[in-house]
């Protein structure tokens, strides 16, 4: 029985070796391509932050893509500076069901509707 176990383990090792060699062959073209690119662009991976010029520009402060970005940032700054008003106690927020007494009085319009004058004409027909 021990002979079979040794034989099986030997076969497993051989299978693993075959898989390892296949993985190495699959990675080899990628590594070769990577080496070609490194030879073509030697300074590519040295500084993760970029050039000194770029770092200096980033240190100066935020720059905007166009006037729209600038105006939006400016509006955000104004909104932060405004004092926050407390919640209005008379504001209906959906906590209760409004009744006709809770609703404000409706304002009468100064201009009468053209449709309202014709209602009388319809009743006469």
UniProtKB/Swiss-Prot annotation:
It comes from the Eukaryota. Keywords: Cell cycle, Cell division, Cytoplasm, Mitosis, Phosphoprotein, Protein phosphatase inhibitor. The keyword Ligase does not apply. Phosphorylation at Ser-67 by gwl during mitosis is essential for interaction with ppp2r2d (PR55-delta) and subsequent inactivation of PP2A. It is found in: Cytoplasm. The keyword Membrane does not apply. Its main location: cytoplasm. Residues 1-53, 81-108 are annotated as: Disordered. InterPro entries: Endosulphine. The modification Phosphoserine is found at residues 67, 109. GO terms for cellular component: cytoplasm. Residues 1-37 have a biased composition (Basic and acidic residues). One of its GO terms (molecular function) is protein phosphatase regulator activity. GO terms for biological process: cell division; G2/M transition of mitotic cell cycle; mitotic cell cycle. The modification Phosphothreonine is found at residues 28, 99. Belongs to the endosulfine family. Protein phosphatase inhibitor that specifically inhibits protein phosphatase 2A (PP2A) during mitosis. When phosphorylated at Ser-67 during mitosis, specifically interacts with ppp2r2d (PR55-delta) and inhibits its activity, leading to inactivation of PP2A, an essential condition to keep cyclin-B1-CDK1 activity high during M phase. This is Alpha-endosulfine.
